[in-house]
Amino acid sequence: MEYMRAKKDVFRFDGYAGADTKYRLKVSVFTEEAWHSLFAKTLFINAEPNELPNWSNDWTIIDASRLELEDPAKYGVRQKLCIVQSLERKLVLIVGTRYAGEIKKSIFYAMNYDLPEVGVFPMHCSANVAKDDPSNVAVFFGLSGTGKTTLSADPKRRLIGDDEHGWSDRGVFNFEGGCYAKCINLSQEGEPQIWNAIRFGSVIENVVVDPVTRVPNYDSAARTENTRVTYPLDFVPDAVDRKSTRLNSSHEWI
């Protein structure tokens, strides 16, 4: 906390995880890097401006991405990089990593812990729905990087979300308000929905960018194969509105 207080600028995001108002969590994210705050704004569901003056959150994330612990053992951890999460205090501390994915995964962990107690099955999956039948929902399970985003990006169906969902007796609902897609070897021909979503307002991560032309090189794995892009559902044509509380009925094809 002292480290963050000493910063000239700290960026704050307030919003929700969970499109279903019955089960959503109110989240506040404090970051030292502006692009991490933009990441949170893109991935979570934004609070309305009139909600912010009296905002009271369920979970707090403190993202000290540039902090390196000089003596990790002093704090009960093994290395300078750590993600510490307290389910009792509803607090997440991210230290020493600039990988923005830790922000979203920490809240997914929280929802995995809390929601089964209230009858919701948390799922690491993508999901879409038929354009003419809201009861025809498909979910695609898989670990990170196995193609969930690609499979759900079907132009003949409406995207619900690409990574984290809940399944209750009220239907399937998205935990998030955006997508977090891998973009190694991305092409317009192969994955047009993802390609077209990369524009002003999206965030590319770990992608090599030409220093002169500023054109991303999606074929390069010079830094890592885990190259990513984050974009709001608003950037996907005919996607289910990320602020919508309308649910899809429980008729799922897996």
Model-assigned labels for residue ranges:
Residues 3, 109-114, 131, 154-158:
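Generic, well-ordered alpha-helical scaffold segments in large soluble proteins
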Residues 23-30, 106, 141, 153-154, ...:
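Short acidic, glycine/serine/threonine-rich loops at helix termini
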Residues 130-162:
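Glycine-rich phosphate-binding P-loop
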Residues 160-225:
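Conserved nucleotide-sensing/catalytic segment adjacent to the nucleotide-binding pocket
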Residues 224-244:
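Long hydrophobic segments that form regular secondary structure
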Residues 243, 247-254:
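Single conserved hydrophobic/aromatic residue that forms the stacking wall/gate
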